[in-house]
UniProtKB/Swiss-Prot annotation:
Keywords: Ribonucleoprotein, Ribosomal protein
GO terms for biological process, alphabetical: negative regulation of translation; translation
Protein name, entry field: Large ribosomal subunit protein uL13
SUPFAM superfamilies: Ribosomal protein L13 (SSF52161)
Cellular component annotations (GO), alphabetically ordered: cytosolic large ribosomal subunit; ribosome
Higher taxonomy: Archaea, Methanobacteriati, Methanobacteriota, Methanomada group, Methanococci
Subunit (UniProt): Part of the 50S ribosomal subunit.
Pfam families xrefs: Ribosomal_L13
Record organism: Methanocaldococcus jannaschii (strain ATCC 43067 / DSM 2661 / JAL-1 / JCM 10045 / NBRC 100440) (Methanococcus jannaschii)
Record function comment: This protein is one of the early assembly proteins of the 50S ribosomal subunit, although it is not seen to bind rRNA by itself. It is important during the early stages of 50S assembly.
Record flagged with keyword Ribosomal protein: yes
InterPro entries given in the database record: Ribosomal_uL13 (IPR005822), Ribosomal_uL13_bac-type (IPR005823), Ribosomal_uL13_CS (IPR023563), Ribosomal_uL13_euk/arc (IPR005755), Ribosomal_uL13_sf (IPR036899)
Family annotation (PROSITE patterns): RIBOSOMAL_L13 (PS00783)
Length: 137
């Protein structure tokens, strides 16, 4: 089991690296999910995620779905899931090997710290995005 500190990591790069590793059979635990960064224009990112969240079932709008997460750990898990062949048994088994936490609740010792160099001031953390989506964490 590898414990990764995700503070300062870019969302897509972190998710792709974790997806590759869990497909190889490694168990991954990610801590500090709220400090993961999405680069780009803050307003555009918030608008995109809110549109995704507000999608309705066209056939019957009273039904619930599709479900989209609000909390930072769930957003990170969903991003990793999108990078796995989730509808196949191999992808489902790999996804079960991923654990994501806000903060470090179990005081796990960090094996790796993944952080990417930010060359821009245009970014938003998952904590800020979650607040805009209405999360209470």
């Amino acid at each position: 089991m590898t414990v990764i500190d995700a503070e300062g990591a870019i969302l897509g790069r972190l998710a792709s690296e974790v997806a590759k590793r869990v497909l190889r059979g490694e168990e991954i635990v990610i801590v500090n999910a709220e400090m993961v960064v999405i680069t780009g224009n803050k307003d555009w990112i918030i608008k995109t995620y809110q549109e995704e969240r507000e999608k309705k079932n066209v056939a019957n709008p009273r039904r619930f779905g599709p479900k989209f997460p609000r909390r930072p750990d769930d957003i990170l898990r969903r991003t990793i899931r999108k990078m796995l062949p989730y509808k196949k048994p191999k992808g489902r088994e790999a996804f079960k090997r991923v654990k994501v936490y806000v903060g470090n609740p179990k005081n796990l010792t960090v094996d790796e710290k993944i952080s990417h160099k930010l060359n821009t001031t245009k970014y938003i953390t998952l904590a800020e995005l979650s607040k805009h989506l209405g999360a209470k964490f």
